[in-house]
Amino acid sequence: MNLASSACLLLLFLLGIAQALPVQNEEGHEEGNKEGHGEEGVEEGDEDDFVDFTTRILTSNNNTDQLLLEGDLVAPTNRNAMKCWYNSCFWKKASNGFVVIPYVISSQYSRGEVATIEGAMRAFNGRTCIRFVRRTNEYDFISVVSKNGCYSELGRKGGQQELSLNRGGCMYSGIIQHELNHALGFQHEQTRSDRDSYVRINWQNIIPASAYNFNKHDTNNLNTPYDYSSIMHYGRDAFSIAYGRDSITPIPNPNVPIGQRNGMSRWDITRSNVLYNCR
């Protein structure tokens, strides 16, 4: 084999190696294979196992200009604080036994993101009598939009009510379920009237301007136990002044996990059934 033939074979070999390597963008990150992801490459599998949902929610809401209570609840304008008088903020139960909640989803979302949102909604099917259905002409409905943050009204507002799921930070099934639970009328677990028997609020570790987010409410606990594993429970460092300075500590066992990442707990499901009298 002459020298020219050897050089040609060597060049073909090197080109084959180059084509087998992953393509990288300008920042050096691999591109191309995103098997199992939605159209935007965002799915629940992307989640960092060490980041809880409330941390993601509060981080996403840092840049919002929406007036929020407790980090992700739209401040009410048509009723007293966080109270729901005479069940006025609960969704109505139909004669067929289902609580039908109409919704529309903004065209801002990709098909993959719509699938993620509707998949989180379907988590209620089969385990509760709650059914999220696409709106036809119903007066009361949820409008899912991508604004700056992840947030919701508390319960049924009446008419159109926005539920924001920012495309950049809220496209996780657990976050979507968290906000849907707010829309059903559920508050954060650590604001329960009996919370002081189960968690200690470390006021000295909380950003002073955010301390009001830890106020207790006169809640209806539906005869269910305090649930450390609830998807509605803050993580232990929510609104903390510094990393490692926990704002919430479980008691008596400080090592009990809170601020989970896996979706609705058994008691979250039970409360939906009790609140809406599911059979």
Curated annotation (Swiss-Prot):
Glycans are attached at N62. Residues 26-40 have a biased composition (Basic and acidic residues). The keyword Glycoprotein applies. Residues 80-279 form the Peptidase M12A domain. Keywords: Cytoplasmic vesicle, Disulfide bond, Glycoprotein, Hydrolase, Metal-binding, Metalloprotease, Protease, Signal, Zinc, Zymogen. Zn(2+) binds at H178, H182, H188. The active site is at E179. Residues 1-20 form the signal peptide. Disulfide bonds join C84-C89, C129-C278, C150-C170. Binds 1 zinc ion per subunit. Its cofactor is Zn(2+). In medaka the hatching enzyme system is composed of two distinct proteases, the high choriolytic enzyme (HCE), of which there are two isoforms, and the low choriolytic enzyme (LCE). This is High choriolytic enzyme 2. It comes from Oryzias latipes (Japanese rice fish). The gene is hceb.
